[in-house]
A protein has these predicted regions:
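Metal-dependent catalytic neighborhoods of phosphoester/phosphodiester hydrolases
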Residues: 137-140, 161-180, 219-232, 388-391, ...
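Short mixed-charge
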Residues: 184-206
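Metal-dependent phosphoesterase/phosphodiesterase active-site architecture
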Residues: 1-35, 40-45, 51-56, 67, ...
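N-terminal active-site segment of His-dependent metallophosphoesterases
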Residues: 4-8, 15-22, 28-31, 42-44, ...
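Proline-centered loop/turn at the N-terminus of a beta-strand
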Residues: 123, 151-152, 207-212, 373-374, ...
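Active-site glycine-centered loops adjacent to acidic/histidine catalytic or metal-binding residues
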Residues: 129, 157-158, 215-216, 380, ...
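Stable alpha-helical elements in mature extracytoplasmic
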Residues: 120, 135-140, 156, 174-181, ...
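Hydrophobic core positions of the immunoglobulin-like beta-sandwich fold
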Residues: 82-83
Length: 562
């Protein structure tokens, strides 16, 4: 605990209902008497305190304290639900925590309210892929300076890089951690053209509820007492592979045959989103085995938001026998299945027959969705994009085993049949038939948008902190050129058949001076705002290479009624 005791974060808002909202904050001490003080009469509500179970640091952490190995970092979460609130009425609040010193610590004062009533005009930030990237603090600062206090934040995944590394959420010394940037307490310095500019992010979520979706960077891989956090993050395997190993050595791993031991072992030896689940309080979706917040739906004013868990591990696109990638295993690992990566494995199914698909089908048919003025579906993986992460198809990897003439295994390759793409073949028809107006996503670190024949809008507004480029004719994606691969992997354009829409207000140009229908820049950062009063989605950019320049609104489109 630092010598100057303080709250680890400002409070932020979660899971509003028609008469309540949850207030959450974090400390590095367990403390006592954690409470929310709210309203003109300064009513108080005591908070429930729990310790995060998996937050750690390691030698790669950017912290004031150095770590030689993976080390557990104690973080406490405090949550209080404020009830009896009136629709449309906001009240002031602050939080108080008492550390072991006995001297209470209070936050600044902010405002809270329940979910807005239908008809109330709202401005909602659409953002994704923060990941402590260089321009994120600048982006969020410009959101606050341009829009003012937003009413909510919809965040389409990839909040941090390594979800179990505590400092990435709270206090990375580079100044771009997740909560500081969304609370106006960041301190990230960009150097552009010889000019250094420090950005603090925007004071946004203290007074506006945050609704995230799970991206691939919210998922930790196999747990280890010795491997670094980066290596653990990059090492998920399917539950089926973990179960096979468990069954082979069940008497060793679980000699008493306890069900909780089995489930814990399988989670630790496959993948998990425990830290994400422990940090956030989100609406719950019913399942046969209980409830989940991995995916959910909620009504916020005139918006029905559906947040899906549609993502997969990101593996290297390099095609060679020395890389455990999306297209093959390392030759050196062929005799050791425990080291196999299993290609671009999908973390949660959206196929027909899966729990998520069944829940979504019911949700899309519900009165809450069908009667909503604006129907918005948020997920991490892109259905349509010029970015790199849309190839190969979003489907279960099909292993191909190569043998020599003597029958020896000499290679494992993975194919991804395009006709089995789960998003395009199963999810998109479901959304289209239900009258969805906006599909919002991220993952490729690019701004571009598309429109289907029926008028469903697709927006990827993920050129927030950085970009990895748009794959046009002069910048093709790395895809397999080996003739052994039978599938076709598109190197340019949107592989799923839509043409990107040129921005309606102002376009950027390529090096030849031609207008381009995207932003893929490490100097220009973009954000989008859903204005429910106008029925409009507007997108803005800011050139960090010209820190004195103005924010530019460059695109807008309306959300038509289906």
């Amino acid at each position: 605990m630092p010598s100057q005791v303080s709250l680890l974060t400002d409070p932020f808002l979660q899971a509003p209902t028609e008469s309540s909202v949850k207030v959450v904050w974090f400390t590095e001490f367990k403390g006592t008497d954690h409470r929310v003080v709210y309203g003109p009469a300064q009513q108080t509500v005591a908070a429930t305190t729990v310790q995060l179970s998996r937050t750690r640091e390691d030698a790669q952490s950017k912290t004031t304290q150095s770590y030689d190995q993976v080390t557990k970092r104690p973080i406490w979460r405090h949550e209080a639900e404020i009830s009896g609130l009136r629709p449309g009425l906001r009240v002031p609040y602050f939080v108080v925590s008492t550390p072991p010193t006995g001297n209470p610590i209070g936050s600044d004062q902010f405002t809270l309210g329940p979910t807005p009533p239908a008809g109330q005009p709202l401005k909602i930030l659409l953002t994704s892929d923060h990941q402590l990237m260089p321009m994120t603090a600048a982006n969020l600062q410009k959101v606050q300076e341009t829009i003012g206090q937003v009413d909510s934040v919809f965040l389409a995944g990839d909040l941090v890089n390594i979800p179990d590394r505590a400092s990435e959420w709270f206090d990375d010394t580079r100044g771009g951690a997740f909560f500081p940037c969304l609370q106006g307490r960041g301190s990230y310095t960009l150097e552009k053209n010889g000019t250094r500019t420090r950005y603090k992010g925007g004071q946004l979520i203290q007074s506006a509820p945050l609704f995230p979706a799970v991206g691939n960077h919210e998922v930790m891989g196999r747990n280890s007492a010795t491997a670094g956090l980066n290596d653990q993050f990059n090492d998920p395997v399917p539950w089926a592979a973990a179960k096979t190993l468990y069954d082979q050595h069940k008497n060793v791993f679980n000699p008493t045959n306890a069900p909780d031991v089995e489930q814990r072992w399988l989670k630790n030896q496959s993948f998990n989103i425990d830290t994400y689940n422990e940090i956030f309080s989100l609406p719950k979706a019913p399942r046969n085995d209980g409830e989940t917040q991995r995916y959910y739906a909620t009504t916020f004013g005139d918006v029905r938001l559906v947040s899906l868990y549609v993502t997969q591990i990101w593996r290297m696109f390099t095609v060679d026998d020395k890389t455990r990638g999306r297209y093959q295993e390392r030759v050196a690992d062929l005799d050791n299945p425990k080291n196999w990566g299993h290609g671009n494995l999908i973390f949660e199914s959206i196929e027909p027959g899966s729990p998520q698909y069944a829940w979504l089908s019911n949700e899309l048919a519900s009165d809450e969705f069908q009667q909503a003025k604006y129907k918005v579906v948020m997920l991490h993986h892109p259905p349509h994009t010029l970015g790199g992460n849309v190839v190969p198809a979003f489907t279960n990897p099909v292993p191909v085993y190569d043998h020599d003439d003597d029958g020896n295994l000499v290679g494992i390759r993975y194919e991804y049949p395009k006709e089995e793409d789960h998003i395009i073949n199963y999810l998109m028809p479901l959304l289209e038939n239900a009258g969805t107006q906006l599909v919002f996503y991220g993952h490729s670190h690019i701004w571009n948008r598309f429109e289907s024949e029926s008028g469903m809008q697709f927006l990827e507004s993920s050129n927030v902190g950085n970009s990895y480029g748009a794959h046009t004719a002069d910048n093709p994606r790395p895809v397999p050129a080996d003739r052994r691969y039978k599938e076709v992997y598109e190197a340019t354009g949107d592989p799923n058949g839509l043409t990107p829409i040129m921005p309606t207000l102002e376009t950027l140009n390529d090096d030849a001076g031609n207008p381009i229908p995207y932003i893929a820049s490490n100097d220009i950062t973009a954000f989008s705002i859903l204005d429910t009063g106008a029925g409009m989605v507007s997108s803005y950019y800011f050139d960090t290479g010209q820190p004195e320049s103005q924010v530019v609104k460059f695109d807008e489109f309306t959300l038509g009624q289906p």
